[in-house]
């Protein structure tokens, strides 16, 4: 016997993306209540980043969460989950500091294509993004690759080319019962 596990989109917490969301809210008098929310046809993977004050960082987060990956089955954030994205950091500047400290999201991935740190930062001058790949080299961090002038609608393609190894397409098959196969015998006619 075997167990076949087809691909399922996941969230950053490891749960399936179509898992119901449980939210606790309060009424106007402070009484807490719980809501279990199922969003039909949607399987979001929200980035583990709080709501930013910088509009451009908010737009980057929205684009990563809402725009489809090049395969059209996943969103860009699902591609990041499949690449093992973790250890998220972000730069959320005030509007006056946006040039000297550009908004950015950085995370670590581990795939067959690339293992290291990925940074997506906003270039205010060109109204584009810059995607950088960094690798730990002993005590120092070295810049491995840099892609300038990445428009928002190119983010998925660039990230797929740099970090997506396609392993998500492989169906997981595991053997449950390793009994010796019975020998078949011919039945006389």
Where are these regions (language model features)?
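Flexible glycine-rich surface loops and low-complexity tracts that mediate binding to linear polymers
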Residues: 1-16
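Eukaryotic intrinsically disordered, low-complexity regulatory linkers and tails enriched in Ser/Thr/Pro
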Residues: 4-6, 105-107, 119-122, 128
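Preference for solvent-exposed, low-hydrophobicity sequence contexts
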Residues: 19-23
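Activation corresponds to long, low-complexity, non-globular regions
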Residues: 30-60, 174-188
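Negatively charged, low-complexity tracts enriched in Asp/Glu with abundant Ser/Thr
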Residues: 46-112
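N-terminal secretory/membrane-targeting helices
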Residues: 53, 67-68, 73, 86, ...
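Intrinsically disordered, low-complexity regulatory segments enriched in Ser/Thr/Pro
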Residues: 114-150
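Polybasic, proline/glycine-rich intrinsically disordered low-complexity segments
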Residues: 140-184
């Amino acid at each position: 016997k075997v167990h076949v596990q087809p691909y399922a989109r996941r969230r950053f917490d490891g749960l399936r993306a179509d898992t119901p969301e449980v939210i606790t809210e309060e009424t106007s008098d402070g009484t807490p209540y719980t809501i279990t929310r199922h969003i039909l046809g949607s399987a979001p993977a929200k980035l583990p980043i709080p709501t930013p004050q910088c509009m451009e960082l908010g737009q980057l987060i929205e684009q990563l969460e809402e725009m489809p990956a090049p395969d059209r089955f996943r969103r860009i954030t699902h591609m990041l989950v499949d690449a093992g994205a973790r250890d998220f950091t972000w730069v959320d500047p005030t509007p006056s500091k946006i040039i000297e400290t550009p908004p950015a999201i950085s995370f670590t991935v581990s795939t067959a294509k690339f293992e290291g740190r990925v940074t997506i930062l906003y270039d205010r001058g060109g109204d584009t993004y810059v995607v950088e790949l960094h690798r730990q080299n002993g005590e120092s961090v070295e810049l491995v690759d840099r892609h300038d002038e990445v428009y928002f609608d190119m983010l998925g393609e660039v990230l797929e080319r740099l970090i997506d190894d396609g392993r998500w397409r492989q169906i997981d098959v595991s053997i449950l019962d390793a009994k010796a196969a019975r020998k078949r015998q011919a039945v006389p006619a």
